[in-house]
Amino acid sequence: MKKYRVQPDGRFELKRFDPDDTSAFEGGKQAALEALAVLNRRLEKLQELLYAEGQHKVLVVLQAMDAGGKDGTIRVVFDGVNPSGVRVASFGVPTEQELARDYLWRVHQQVPRKGELVIFNRSHYEDVLVVRVKNLVPQQVWQKRYRHIREFERMLADEGTTILKFFLHISKDEQRQRLQERLDNPEKRWKFRMGDLEDRRLWDRYQEAYEAAIRETSTEYAPWYVIPANKNWYRNWLVSHILVETLEGLAMQYPQPETASEKIVIE
């Protein structure tokens, strides 16, 4: 899925990516759902292998505008995986304790251990997105954080962490429809907050901030993928495909038993 991977050449432009794009899958929604079911079963096996081998660490970062589909992606793509080896870490407004430390402190505590796959629902990237858009810190502060993040992720990669970063790219009109659906559906209304409307008014500034963050921090060791996310079925299939392809590339193997257990007969 090279077309969705952001190259570290400093030329990334978000406008080149169409949130309605479905060109990487030959077929419609139903065929994609069937393909996703196959990928889910494959991911289940690969995650079991990751856990059993206990050597690799995998970090998946999900970022998106409000209503961009982070929760839905986690729910669908990781359906069926073993909870003992998979963990979701969500990053909301920093607590008083977190604010008393550097902004990466709370993030570093949540990175995966050997054999574990961790999904970041939002992440350290909020500290070059929200803080920039809402002027929470001076420019000279958030500007330095691009370098901090590159070096932080370089350290994780050097220590054996495979990093995949996904920006779930939706259009402004698609966001409007999804937010309205939340308001109109009593079972989804709990997800709506008034701050969503404030952030929506800052749409263009957020797009600029995302473009800069992705351009500055997509590297060979921690690449960004821009995922067209207006259509949920395509988003889920594409994220799953990239994840499965990456895990297969790790060439993992089940560990050898301590003894020749295949010869043991239990009486």
Curated annotation (Swiss-Prot):
SUPFAM superfamilies: P-loop containing nucleoside triphosphate hydrolases
Gene3D superfamilies per UniProt: P-loop containing nucleotide triphosphate hydrolases (3.40.50.300)
Thermal dependence summary for this entry: Optimum temperature is 60-70 degrees Celsius.
Pfam families on file: PPK2
EC number, as in UniProt: 2.7.4.-
InterPro entries: P-loop_NTPase, Polyphosphate_phosphotransfera, PPK2-rel_1, PPK2-related
Gene Ontology MF: a single term: polyphosphate kinase activity
Gene Ontology BP terms: polyphosphate metabolic process
Cofactor: Mn(2+)
Keyword Metal-binding set for record: no
Stated consequence of mutating E126G: 6-fold decrease in synthesis of ATP from AMP
Reaction(s) the record says it catalyses: [phosphate](n) + ADP = [phosphate](n+1) + AMP; [phosphate](n) + ATP = [phosphate](n+1) + ADP
Family classification: Belongs to the polyphosphate kinase 2 (PPK2) family. Class III subfamily.
NCBIfam families in UniProt: PPK2_rel_1
PANTHER family in the cross-refs: POLYPHOSPHATE:AMP PHOSPHOTRANSFERASE (PTHR34383:SF3), POLYPHOSPHATE:AMP PHOSPHOTRANSFERASE-RELATED (PTHR34383)
Function text: Uses inorganic polyphosphate (polyP) as a donor to convert both AMP to ADP and ADP to ATP. Can also use GMP, CMP, UMP, GDP, CDP and UDP.
Entry protein name: AMP/ADP-polyphosphate phosphotransferase
Phylogenetic classification of the source organism: Bacteria, Thermotogati, Deinococcota, Deinococci, Thermales
